[in-house]
Each structure stands twice: as C-alpha cells, then as structure tokens.
Amino acid sequence: TIAGMIGMAVLYYFNFAPAWSVIVVNAILASFLHELEHDLIHSLYFRETSVEKMMMWGVWMFRVNTPSPFYRKKIHLLHHKESGQLSDIEEQMIGNGMKWGLTRIVVMLDQGLAFLINSRRVGKTAPKLSKAEMAKAAFPFTYIYQATSLLFINGNLYLLLMPLFNAGFVAPAWLVQMITVVNFLAVVIGLPNFIRQGCLQIVSSSMHYFGDVNPDGTVGVLEQCQVMTARSWYMLPFQLFCFNFGSTHAIHHFIVNQPFYLRQLGAGYSHAAMKKYGVRFDDHGSFARANRYHPASPALLPAGEGSLS
C-alpha cells in the first residue's frame, strides 16, 4: 500500500497522473493503511516484535494527520472495554454524543480542532484522558501536517489574491518554490489523508451509539454499533474512503481479533447473525438523537457546549 502511494506520487511528479487521480487513489490506499493499523493495534501480526513496531511507524508516516498508533492502541482498547460510555475517549473526541451542527462537523473533519474543542470536556468524563499525553502523541507528524496545511491554504490564497490588489505584484522566487513543494505534498499525502480521515470519522461517529449504551458488555455489545449497508446510500461516498467501515466495523465489536480482510469477506454471514440477535441496521434516526440508542434518552452533548446537560 505504501509502495502504491509512493508510486502515485512519482507518476504525479513526472506529470503522468493528474492531481485529482492521485488524491483519490492515495486516499483509498491510505484507508487500507488504517485497517492495517487497526489490526496492528490488536496485535494480529508479528506480536511484540521489531517488525510490528516498524509497521506501526510506517502506517503512521503515511497517515500523517493521526496520533501515534502506539497511543491510539491505548484509547482504542479502552473503546472496546467501555464503548458508548462517558469514559470512551476515542469516540467522544470525534463527535459522538454531540448534536449535529457546525461544531460537530468541525470536530469530525479536523483532528487538531477536535482536540482544542473537545479535550477539556472529555477530560471531565473520561479520567483516563491525559491532554498532555494526547498532545505528545501527535508529535511529529500531525504537527507537520497541520503546519503544512496552513501553508497550503494561506500561501495559495496569498498568491491568488495579491494580484487583485496590486497589478504589479510579483511573488518572491523563494515563496513560489516553497508553495510548489507544499502543493506537491498536499496532493500526494495531505489531501488524501484529509479526505480519508474525514470520511472515516463521519462514518464512525455516525454508526456508534453513545451515552445510553448498556454498560454490561454481554448486552451492551448489541447496542454499541449499527450496521450501515447500501440502504444508507448517503454514506456510500464516505464508505469508499474508509474501506466500507460502516458496514463491517460492528462485526469487529463481536469478533475483535479478526483481520480486516476476513471481516470483509465474511460480512454477509456476520450480518445475518447480527440481525438475528437484534443489532440495528441503517438506523437513520440516530443522527437526530445525537448517537443515543434509545429514542427517549436525553441529549447528552449539545453542539457548541462544553459540559453535559
């Protein structure tokens, strides 16, 4: 997968592939890396070896807008243990429990802003959250990504708008060269990962239930996730860039140590069993309920507010 992303970058550099194709293909390839990282977090390959660590570093380097997988392992395993509870750090940080609105959309799309918006509130309900540890886990790749993103947006806006205010404007050569490099990085890794991460978090924060899930694991596992099939047609564009996450992730809550490719291959059989035992499919009403499982439950995390109501 990494070789594929590098290959697309080479094709783009030598003008053999248009920018849009590189962005789309690398976003899809990066979604494979997320699934591989997820399996590594559950120690499915080369457990506790240098090869496992090397693979985790590799998936992080090519998915630059995420925290360290070594830190993600900690909060993801907590997610499995306490999914849907107020102590679930992972899902709260991407918007679970918030009413739909601008704040939630921002939280789902941008990890940096999600940290600034949600970390204080989540810290009150999830005692295992350390803001300092989470900030450290973003170093160095997420900080490089954020800085490069700001250069990409502001640099291109500057070069675009300055001639409108000054007809004789000539951009300095160093600035043009720097923005050329930044634009290349944006096409081959920045924008693909923005699309991948945004799609994943939109799907994940929509399919998980939160706040009123039964804390008894034997019962609660049936309430932790819904399954989003093709009937949730509005999710299909997002599913493309997160490896069909909405359809298969709920299976993972039941069969934790199953590699992602087997989960995809056996999805039809798993769905039949899950439906038999009452797992919900295409529960469109959960959007209006701010991820609550039960329609009568009170709203927990109103958009834009920093405390529980």
Residue ranges and their predicted role:
Residues 27-36, 205, 245-250:
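Short alpha-helical catalytic segment bearing the HExxH-like zincin motif
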Residues 45-64, 89-100, 217-235:
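Juxtamembrane helix-capping/reentrant segments at transmembrane boundaries
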